[in-house]
């Protein structure tokens, strides 16, 4: 009590002081795993913490460790050869999704109230939907965001973290109710149908928004071909540094220790008339 009186807590600076949290394994944590989930990097340790871990610590969170994720965060399920599968706490025979699957499992099971995630192609949204959590995919430049159980927790973190402050983007209008919100009951994969449970959830959300005064309109046909989007997203990984680095020392003997996606994207950068096809060098 005397120490607290002499050194009072600055709750404005550390609003989450003492709250236990976990960091996604892809988010660098000092003295923690730094393998990117690649089996060939087994035992590699981080010398320092990355931006997410530093931000969590600055806000007062007590970081207990790191969570599971797929190799290089590429897959939408969490099952790397290095760390194995992330079990869904609602049904351990099922996966938590990916790539922030370990974080989703940890929060959904009650291990911690918050765990960091990252999302480019669904890596927060998919695990959240598979485990019943709130998973916000913020505006483009804010790709790092935690997984939590309630929208109140998501709002509290988003308002306090410096990682969410816009730097170059146009500020949103003050009166959000002037914006028109679109929704659809179609999927971008045109041969697939939404489940009745998903449709019910969407329509309940639409009803809520309309009661709150928002203008909501249905889009009858999804404007994007999801299969073309998947192709573009995948091809975009060709030549990416992390994939090239992962296959740099691959041999015929150890290449089975790599995820086929990693191997394919990493070696594709060597294809071409002047390419060096010796990926073992």
Region roles according to the model:
Residues 1-11, 160-281:
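Amidase signature
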Residues 22, 40-44, 144-149, 272-274:
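Short, well-ordered beta-strand elements within core beta-sheets of diverse protein domains
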Residues 36-47, 182-185, 190:
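Peri-catalytic substrate-binding/gating loops that frame the active-site cleft of hydrolases
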Residues 45, 49-52, 202-206:
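Short catalytic helix/loop segments, enriched in acidic residues and glycine
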Residues 48-50, 54-155:
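Short glycine/serine-rich loop segments
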């Amino acid at each position: 009590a005397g120490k607290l009186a002499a050194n009072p807590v600055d709750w404005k600076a550390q609003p989450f002081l003492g709250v236990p949290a976990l960091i996604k394994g892809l988010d660098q944590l000092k003295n923690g795993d730094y393998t990117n989930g690649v089996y060939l990097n087994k035992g590699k340790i981080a010398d320092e913490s990355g931006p997410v871990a530093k931000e969590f610590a600055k806000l007062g969170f007590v970081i207990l460790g790191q969570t599971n994720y797929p190799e290089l965060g590429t897959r939408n399920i969490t099952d790397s050869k290095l760390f194995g599968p992330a079990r869904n706490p609602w049904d351990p025979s099922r996966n938590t999704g990916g790539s922030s699957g370990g974080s989703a499992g940890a929060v959904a099971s009650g291990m911690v109230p918050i765990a960091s995630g990252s999302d480019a192609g669904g890596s927060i949204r998919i695990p959240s939907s598979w485990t019943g959590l709130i998973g916000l995919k913020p505006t483009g430049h804010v790709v790092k965001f935690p997984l939590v159980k309630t929208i109140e927790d998501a709002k509290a973190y988003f308002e306090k973290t410096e990682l969410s402050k816009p730097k170059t983007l146009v500020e949103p209008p003050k009166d959000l109710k002037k914006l028109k919100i679109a929704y659809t009951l179609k999927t971008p994969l045109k041969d697939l149908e939404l489940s009745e449970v998903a449709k019910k959830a969407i329509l309940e959300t639409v009803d809520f928004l309309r009661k709150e005064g928002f203008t909501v309109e249905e889009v009858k046909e999804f404007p994007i071909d999801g299969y073309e989007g998947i192709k573009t997203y995948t091809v975009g990984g060709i030549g990416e540094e992390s994939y090239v680095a992962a296959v740099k020392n691959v041999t015929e003997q150890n290449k089975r220790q790599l995820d086929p996606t990693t191997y394919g994207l990493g070696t594709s950068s060597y294809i071409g008339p002047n390419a060096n096809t010796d990926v073992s060098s």
